[in-house]
Curated annotation (Swiss-Prot):
[4Fe-4S] cluster 2 binds at residues 160, 164, 167. This is Ribosomal protein uS12 methylthiotransferase RimO. One of its GO terms (cellular component) is cytosol. InterPro entries: Elp3/MiaA/NifB-like_rSAM, Methylthiotransferase, Methylthiotransferase_CS, Methylthiotransferase_N, Methylthiotransferase_N_sf, NA-bd_OB-fold, Ribosomal_uS12_MeSTrfase_RimO, rSAM. One of its GO terms (molecular function) is 4 iron, 4 sulfur cluster binding. Pfam families: Radical_SAM, TRAM_2, UPF0004. Residues 390-462 form the TRAM domain. Residues 10-125 form the MTTase N-terminal domain. The keyword Iron applies. Its cofactor is [4Fe-4S] cluster. It comes from the Bacteria. Its EC number is 2.8.4.4. Belongs to the methylthiotransferase family. RimO subfamily.
Length: 462
């Protein structure tokens, strides 16, 4: 651990694990600490104190979080734990983190910014009060970001009103709480003004935005605006247009209200991309999961979306081997996948999540069978994806550049509208043919698709 001197500000190390929602919590914590005069450290050894924002949803995430806490304690010694794992109980009913790592300075659950700040202040007094606008260039409202400068996550709500039997998120993060629409749009405007070229809208359930407020009318720039996803997306599209920026929607449940968003995608006002967590297709499995929609309605809805916007890309996640899943129910899922032609897929073999109702459902399947079904599912999904990628060869696409070595003369890596960062594929860019052409991170380029490389595309910048 570094010894702090009077000549420099105290330094905070931050590790953010888990989903983009947790990442935005980490950004909020760091924004406030930076406003108070704390500096950040990229290493445990260079920090005076380390904050670990944990994930506690599935067993692998719990292990990663606990291992990271142990590593931070070993290399630094002063550790504050926050996030979903901080709200989990151990075998004896006590706090899991406290049981396994009793030397941590403090433990909080998710969305506990003030508690984390209080713990930091107790253990590493703040150098000054936050009387300044934090980031130049219009970014003060948006705060610090842990993503690359050209894209950012915009969290529109917290918590979830669903009680899916495989999930403990409502226990960890509570019921749905939507952000005021004016606050969301102010942050979006600041992000665009600060150079963000892609805004990724996230929450636990984006389709339900405003339900807890009964869609009441808010105000933004002196104009009335209903707190509802349609109005929010319309306003985000209008904000993005002058900057030529993208708006990408995540965690959108297939409610009837989502149908109104598809014409906006067809008109080019937001990206024709939807992240829709379907989880399964068979009505009986969805009933056991307590999911809010049926597989038949989902298939019909996706088909209607494609009629309105043929270019739409659908990403989804699925669970196979759920308790009681029969062979016929699994085959139903494979048939659904083929019929729906899902573009991007994530699939998990069901695993116990401590505290989830599904753990006590009858018909728990052997893990080898769950893994076998996942492998079969992914084989079908990858064949569908490969065929769709092959059809893009010869097309010209807009690509947002994420990496450009050699001053932009050696090619690079970017993404098309069909690719969300970290979870989807990429577009590998060849070196520009024109001497005058260079690639720059955070800027767009037109590229001609010349080949397919696994889940990715190969393209020649134009």
């Amino acid at each position: 651990m570094t010894t702090m001197t009077a000549e420099r500000a105290p330094r905070i190390g931050m590790v953010s694990l888990g989903c983009p929602k947790a990442l935005t919590d980490s950004e909020l914590i760091l924004t406030q600490l930076s406003a108070e005069g704390y500096e950040t450290s990229k290493t445990f050894q260079g920090a005076d104190l380390v904050i670990v924002n944990t994930c506690g949803f599935i067993d692998d995430a719990v292990k990663e979080s606990l291992d990271t806490i142990g590593e931070a304690l070993a290399e630094n010694g002063k550790v504050i734990v926050t996030g979903c794992l901080g709200a989990r109980t151990g075998a004896d009913g006590g706090n899991m983190v406290r049981q396994l790592h009793p030397s941590v300075l403090a433990v909080t659950g998710p969305q506990a910014t003030q508690q984390v700040l209080d713990a930091v202040h107790r253990n590493l007094p703040k150098p000054h009060d936050p009387f300044i606008d934090l980031v130049p260039g219009g970014m003060g409202i948006a705060g610090l970001k842990l993503t690359p400068r050209h894209y950012a996550y915009l969290k529109i709500s917290e918590g979830c009103n669903h009680r899916c039997t495989f999930c403990i998120i409502p226990t960890l993060r509570g019921a749905l709480v939507s952000r005021p629409i004016g606050a969301v749009l102010n942050e979006a405007r600041a992000l665009f003004a600060g150079g963000v070229k892609e805004l990724l809208v996230i929450s636990q359930d984006s389709s339900a935005y405003g339900v807890d407020m009964q869609y009441r009318t808010g105000f933004w720039d002196g104009q009335p605006l209903k707190t509802r996803l349609l109005e929010l997306v319309q306003a985000l599209g209008a904000l993005a247009e002058p900057y030529g920026a993208w708006v990408r929607l995540h965690y959108v449940y297939p409610y009837p209200s989502v149908d109104a968003l598809i014409p906006l995608m067809a008109q080019g006002r937001v990206l024709p991309y939807l992240d829709v967590p379907l989880q399964h297709s068979h009505p009986e499995v969805l009933r056991r999961m307590k999911r809010p929609a049926s597989g038949e309605r989902n298939l019909e809805r996706i088909q209607r979306w494609r009629e309105v916007c043929p270019e739409i890309v659908i990403r989804s996640s699925f669970i196979v081997g759920f308790p009681g899943e029969t062979q016929a129910e699994f085959e139903h899922l494979l048939d659904f996948l083929r019929a729906a032609r899902i573009d991007r897929v994530g699939c998990f073999a069901y695993s116990d999540v401590s505290g989830a109702v599904a753990n006590d459902l009858p018909g728990m399947l052997p893990m080898p069978l769950r893994q076998e079904r996942r492998a079969r599912f992914m084989a079908v999904a990858e064949a569908l994806s490969s065929a769709k990628l092959q059809r893009r060869v010869g097309a010209t696409m807009q690509v947002l550049i994420d990496a450009a070595p050699g001053l932009g003369r050696k090619g690079g890596v970017g993404r098309s509208y069909a690719d969300a960062p970290e979870i989807d594929g990429a577009v590998h860019l060849l070196p520009p043919e024109k001497i005058s052409k260079t690639l720059k991170v955070g800027e767009f380029t037109q590229a001609r698709i010349v080949g397919v490389r696994g889940h990715d595309l190969l393209a020649q910048p134009i």
